[in-house]
Amino acid sequence: MARKYELRERAENIAATRARIVEATVALHEQLGPARTTISAIAGRANVQRLTVYRHFPDERSLFQACSAHWTSRHPRPDAAAWELIGDPRERLRAALLEIYTFFRRTEGMTGHVLRDLHESPALREVAEPLVQYWLHVREVLDEGWQAHGRQRTLLRAAVGHAIAFETWHSLTGREGLSDAAAAAAMVELVGAVEG
């Protein structure tokens, strides 16, 4: 009976150590970004040895996957399926941008750092691929129903893509000082103006 208890306790300790490493990684990625986070910094923050980090996560990809899964579970992306139920494309865009910009506000540190660091790490790009696909799907959902054709359709699609970009939100609410709601309204007007 003592052996089973010891095995269970050991498994719990391993899980707790892994969780500390993941939490430390998430915190450092939010603060510094994935490219500037070192294994030494993760180990220090998690209060473990570097070798312990490597035992749990033998490569960048496995560490990024664990970090991404943990962070995403705490910060779910807006539900694009709900927007598909809104028939009017302008109202759909307005509702979506309000949710998207609120999401960006809550996740600004991590989102900004990950986007900045994507070009530096093939492992990060691989782990972020579902995120890239999500944003492509969002653009498809928000592109539906507008009455634009030909060149205007191309411009409208670009305007929708611009409206949902983190960098657009960051510029409008940071440098330009708009609220999330005012930034969303401005982007709805921009896309509407492209439609004509």
Cite the ranges covered by each PLM segment:
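Short helix-capping/turn signature of helix-turn-helix
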Residues: F57, R116-E120, A163
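Basic, helix-initiating cap at the start of DNA-binding domains
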Residues: M1-L51, H56, S62
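Residues in the recognition helix of alpha-helical DNA-binding motifs
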Residues: H56-F57, A186
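Alpha-helical DNA-contacting segments of helix-turn-helix folds
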Residues: H29, F64-W71
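Short, basic, alpha-helical segments at the C-terminal edge of helix-turn-helix-like DNA-binding modules
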Residues: I39, S68-P76
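Hydrophobic alpha-helical connector segments
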Residues: A66, R77-G109, V132
